[in-house]
């Protein structure tokens, strides 16, 4: 028997979130800054990560991690075979989100890996707001969608939206599909995951 080095890394960068989703309680979990960038540098310097080809950045809201772009640099430094990186965002604060994502796009294009990012939508209009429990959630997310599509005209990266089926939005899948057809947006559909450790949502 010989252990095979991992090629996929799902990286939860933070439990900090500016949303209060009905299907996720990560915003209630104790937040701490976790590792410092230097500690991350030492961690990713381990041979365990040398053959990573795909990194999926997740969390609560990844763009709230102040060192997010620096962490991408660190991963690129230590993962010579890195081919693709993805990140999902709620898109609520357009200026912060676009600024962070554009910087990651620049790193990806400089280092030669593909970066893909998606704005999460749980429904159209009030349906999205009811699930995220954030004022004007849908309008704010769509503002970010439009800004990222404008950025796509200048820089190379993959972009779209993501929709997660939960008990609260079963009827919204079709509406999101029609919206994405109308707006010519790529969309990925998935089923909600439940984990007490990751999301605190087993209740």
What does each of the following model-derived ranges do?
Residues 109-203:
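Radical SAM enzyme [4Fe-4S]-AdoMet core and its adjacent flexible, acidic
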